Amino acid sequence: MGAQLSTLSHVVLSPVWFIYSLFMKLFQRSTPAITLENPDIKYPLRLIDKEVISPDTRRFRFALPSPQHILGLPIGQHIYLSTRIDGNLVIRPYTPVSSDDDKGFVDLVVKVYFKDTHPKFPAGGKMSQYLENMKIGDTIEFRGPNGLLVYQGKGKFAIRADKKSNPVVRTVKSVGMIAGGTGITPMLQVIRAVLKDPNDHTVCYLLFANQSEKDILLRPELEELRNEHSARFKLWYTVDKAPDAWDYSQGFVNEEMIRDHLPTPGEEPLILMCGPPPMIQFACLPNLERVGHPKERCFTF
């Protein structure tokens, strides 16, 4: 009798267990594993590919712990890379250019500041040169997420004044962005998040400043997005040294460029900025104020 009950329970429970197991597998597949589980822990990631984009710009691809992992970086946040160089701990912030939907890898686009190329910085960039010299298979430590802004979708930005503050959520219909050089990476992260959602009607305006046309990072990606989403993404460049037949602006970011290529103050947009501190301090903020954009609607990464 006991054997019969055992057999019967096995027959009854087997389909139930099968359904439960199938459900758990489907659930696990629908929620990918997150790499950056704790912002206070450093995660060593392995370099698996390096692409030369220009003489001084590289795209570095790092493997996540498994092909099923995502990085786990909220839109608007960044990571820190840390390593020891000549016995000293060096830490630098970077924003990935890959999507957080990408599984198994994370991409960083980095401008390499080589030694003896800039008279004010003869030693060059410590971290960028370290990355340049990394070999495939080498590891470096990632830590994050970090940052004071998170894009929640459909025009909603959660912004904190500092790390200890509670976030204030602002909902906008348009976003003005001013980027300089490598400051394009957090902007691209937000732009992609907006444009990949057909139900997000936020309009992004990007004013992108560089020294020369050849210095424009991620130009193919930006122009592809503009061509595919011309109603929701407006793109404008300015360069210090313009080539012949240049169709965009020349010179530092000024009041006229902001008036012509960013949303008006009347639209109550959020203005995002990322670039060299002198550009933010002397070109962006004073001219935004002249145009009428209040400081409380301006955020610097």
UniProtKB/Swiss-Prot annotation:
InterPro entries in UniProt: CBR-like, Cbr1-like_FAD-bd_dom, FAD-bd_FR_type, Flavoprot_Pyr_Nucl_cyt_Rdtase, FNR_nucleotide-bd, OxRdtase_FAD/NAD-bd, Riboflavin_synthase-like_b-brl
UniProt keyword NADP present: no
Residues annotated for FAD binding in this entry: 92-94, 109, 111, 114, 126-128, 185
Pfam families the UniProt entry points to: FAD_binding_6 (PF00970), NAD_binding_1 (PF00175)
Cofactors named for this entry: FAD
EC number(s) recorded for this UniProt protein: 1.6.2.2
Entry membrane topology: Lipid-anchor
N-myristoyl glycine: lipidated positions: 2
Alphabetical UniProt keywords: Acetylation, Cholesterol biosynthesis, Cholesterol metabolism, Endoplasmic reticulum, FAD, Flavoprotein, Lipid biosynthesis, Lipid metabolism, Lipoprotein, Membrane, Mitochondrion, Mitochondrion outer membrane, Myristate, NAD, Oxidoreductase, Phosphoprotein, Steroid biosynthesis, Steroid metabolism, Sterol biosynthesis, Sterol metabolism
Residue positions, PTM Phosphotyrosine: 43
Modified residues (N6-acetyllysine): 42, 50, 120
Catalysis: reaction(s): 2 Fe(III)-[cytochrome b5] + NADH = 2 Fe(II)-[cytochrome b5] + NAD(+) + H(+)
Compartmental location: Endoplasmic reticulum membrane; Mitochondrion outer membrane
Task of the protein: Catalyzes the reduction of two molecules of cytochrome b5 using NADH as the electron donor.
PANTHER family: NADH-CYTOCHROME B5 REDUCTASE, NADH-CYTOCHROME B5 REDUCTASE 3
Oligomer status and interactors: Component of a complex composed of cytochrome b5, NADH-cytochrome b5 reductase (CYB5R3) and MTARC2. Interacts with MTLN; the interaction is required to maintain cellular lipid composition and leads to stimulation of mitochondrial respiratory complex I activity.
Family stated for the protein in its record: Belongs to the flavoprotein pyridine nucleotide cytochrome reductase family.
Annotated protein name in UniProt: NADH-cytochrome b5 reductase 3
